[in-house]
Every structure is written in C-alpha cells, then in structure tokens.
Amino acid sequence: DSIRLSLLTCAPGEEIYSLFGHTAIRYENPSQGIDIVFNYGLFSFNTPNFIFRFSLGETDYQLGVTDYEHFAAEYAFYGRSVWQQTLNLTDEEKTELIQLLQENYRPENRVYRYNFFYDNCATRPRDKIEESIAGKVVYPTEPQDGSRTFRDIVHQYCKGHPWARFGIDLCIGSEADQPITQRQMMFAPFYLMDAFDGAQISTDTYSRPLVKTNELIIDVTPEPDESGWMPTPLQCSLLLFILTAAATIYGIRRRTGLWGIDLVLFGMAGIVGCVLAFLALFSQHPAVSSNFLLLVFHPGQLLFLPYIVYCVRKGKKCWYLTLNLVVLTLFIVLFPAIPQRFDFAVVPLALVLLIRSASNLIVTSKKK
C-alpha cells in the first residue's frame, strides 16, 4: 500500500503564536498524485473584531488543506525544522482517517472554537488519529500524570522570550499551576510527538507501535537573533522601583505629594487591572478566571484615581491608599504561600505601588 499518513511536528517560530511549535497531518497517495497537509492552525488577523474576540476567548480557527510542497517551503523559509512520524495504520484505518479529515474539511465543519490548552492544532490531529484506529492507543508512562503544570510547559517554550513569558504569566491564574495529566500535556506539539513515539495500538489480540518511523524531513538552522540587547521585565521593574523609591524619598523630605507620579503609576496599574478583570470575568480562555494578581492590579486603581490625585495634591490622607497599603503588604508577605506562581518582576511592581501608598500616610502625618 503506497498510501502514507504522517504526523508532522514543526519547530517553534519567533511570533508569540508560534512559540510552541505546530502540528499537522500529511497525506500521501503517489498513485493519485496526492501529497497534501491537513492543518488545524489557520486563522486570520483580518477577521472582524479579531482582538476583541480573541480577548473573549472566542477565536475561531479552521482546518485548511495545502500542498506539501508549499507547506515545506514556508517552514524552510522561516527557518523552522519539521519532523515526520509515519503512522503504523492498517488499510482500513488509513481509509477511516482520510474520510474523517475530508468530512472535517467540509465548509460547514472546518471552523472550530480554538482553546489554547484543550482544543488546538495539536489536540485535533491526535483526536482524529485516535478516532480512526480500531483499538486503543496506549501512551508511554513518561512523563507521568501530575509531573507538569500548564505554566511549566508555557515557561519551557517561552525560554529566550522573557516578555512573552511575562505577558502570559500576567494573564493566566492559579488554575495553570494545577498538576495536569499526560494527555493534557499534549496541547504542546512536541509533547504530542514524544507521546506518539512511545505509543502502542492495543487490541484484544495484539499490539503494534503507533509510529513506524520518525525522521527529520526539513532540517534548517534558525537565523541568529540580531535584534540586539533588550532589558527583561525584571530589569525594567527593578529600575522603576529604584526611581520610584528615590522620588518618594525626595517627596517625603520635601513634605510634598508627587501626584504626577501617582497619576501615571496607579493609572497604568488600573489599566492592567481592567484587562485582568475582563479576562477573569468574561473570557472563555482557560486558566484566567482565578488570578491572584488582581490583588495588585485591579480596576480600583483606575476607578479611584481622581480621588487619589485629589488627596495627594491637597495633602490630605487618602483612605483608599491606606487600604491599598494593607492589601499590598499582605500580598508581599504572603507571596510564597499564594497558590499561584508569579513572574518575579511582579514583586518590584507591587513594591512600587506599596511605597507610593505609604508615602501618602507619611507625608500627611508629617504635616500635622
């Protein structure tokens, strides 16, 4: 049988949406001149209200089909290697998988609601392959259930991209720190590839490997990053803390409130808080609903900003800043015990808001 079906795993790219790699299914039928790729990762930034729908977690992806030649040329052009795992399927299973993919490619079926952790370009091919098999796919025991969290895997693939890691860490909450099963780890294409490598197709009478061969079919060396040095989130937050601390000491010595600094700092914190609150309350994205960073960045920082500025300008004690000081102090003290992993750059940012809140108490008490 000359028909061959394979799982393709593509190396990560430089864009944030490609940092985790990509998965597709290749279908080869030389007798009919067919060599195509089924790709569940198609989306368009030009979709109406794309940014708003994305923030709501209502991004629609779709299954696309392209010639393998064009698929390979694109990944080679962008310096992304591709691995091919030829599937060890019977003729009946091959026919079933082809029919499932063709049915899924019908216009009324090809669009699906994307979910970063649970329904993406890696989980869809896995599910279709499993559905086509007359038996059960038994995956290897490593990595064990509970040995990873979603955040662990995010950090693994954001290595070398500190701002992407920082941004994702801001948005995902404590749910991302819960241990996950091996199957859940397969949202990441290379975890899926490793699982397929050791998987067996088990029936009542025999078992066979899921994968016949695994080969590197596009071998390219990525271009070196020539973007130059860029400060990390931690370096930026530490610099902001030092500058804010120096300005605050100056203001306390002069017994004056620096309302312009408070306007910028609490305004920025409030804007970030509005984004986090929106994600927590309205978004369908996974793992964003229980975010303890809302103790630091929340809409109240923006809502009470006019009152904060008024009190600081008039040299009056601000009850909101007093409450803010208490909450931020508790956050810093209890930081190690909070059931959520934070990027450490958050600590200097929290301290910035804390010392600005404390400065109001100190300055107003000195004026009495």
Spans of model-derived segments:
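Interfacial loop-to-transmembrane junctions
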Residues: L321-L323
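Catalytic-site beta-strand/loop segments enriched in glycine and acidic/polar residues
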Residues: S2-L8, L101-P107
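A structural motif
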Residues: L89-Q102
